[in-house]
Amino acid sequence: MIKEELNLWAEGVEFRHWDAYYNFILSVLNFLCIKEYELSVILCNNEYIQKLNGEFRQKPEPTDVLSFNYFEGSEQINHKIQGDIIISLEYLEFSSLEFNVEMYEELQRNTIHGILHLIGYTHDTNDFQNETMLIIQERVLRETRRVF
């Protein structure tokens, strides 16, 4: 049975904005009408995410965000979540500089990205103008973005 459970922790990194981040995630879940969830979010370094990326996706390199859905095989958008999101803060430091955005915004964008994958959205490219998932991601970010 799914309930409302949200767990956050860090692996190999320090993070000081847990309360604000927790409330941000709750606002995203609410905005997306997700009422039932068991979600863990791990903020980590490149070494940690690279190990997982190599093990589960056969890509032995760091990445920004990974999502692990416990409802594998679902082909439709589901408004229940049971899964994990892993985000490399170290990776986001570089991408925030590359895209000229604040670190907290890049963290929020990648958190939304992970949540959208968990409810069934996918994308074939990183085209923010034409990919439905990425268009939704940016809309959710505009509506829920917070400074912390």
From Swiss-Prot:
The protein's required cofactors: Zn(2+)
Annotated compartments: Cytoplasm
Keywords of the record: Cytoplasm, Endonuclease, Hydrolase, Metal-binding, Nuclease, Ribosome biogenesis, rRNA processing, Zinc
InterPro entries on file: MetalPrtase_cat_dom_sf_prd, YbeY, YbeY_CS
Cofactor comment text: Binds 1 zinc ion.
Keyword Cytoplasm: yes
Enzyme Commission (EC) number: 3.1.-.-
GO cellular component, one term: cytoplasm
SUPFAM superfamilies: Metalloproteases ('zincins'), catalytic domain (SSF55486)
Enzyme class: hydrolase
GO MF annotations, alphabetized: metalloendopeptidase activity; RNA endonuclease activity; zinc ion binding
Protein residues bound to Zn(2+): 113, 117, 123
Gene Ontology BP terms: rRNA processing
Record function comment: Single strand-specific metallo-endoribonuclease involved in late-stage 70S ribosome quality control and in maturation of the 3' terminus of the 16S rRNA.
Family per record: Belongs to the endoribonuclease YbeY family.
Protein name (Swiss-Prot/TrEMBL): Endoribonuclease YbeY
The species this protein was found in: Borrelia duttonii (strain Ly)
Gene field: ybeY
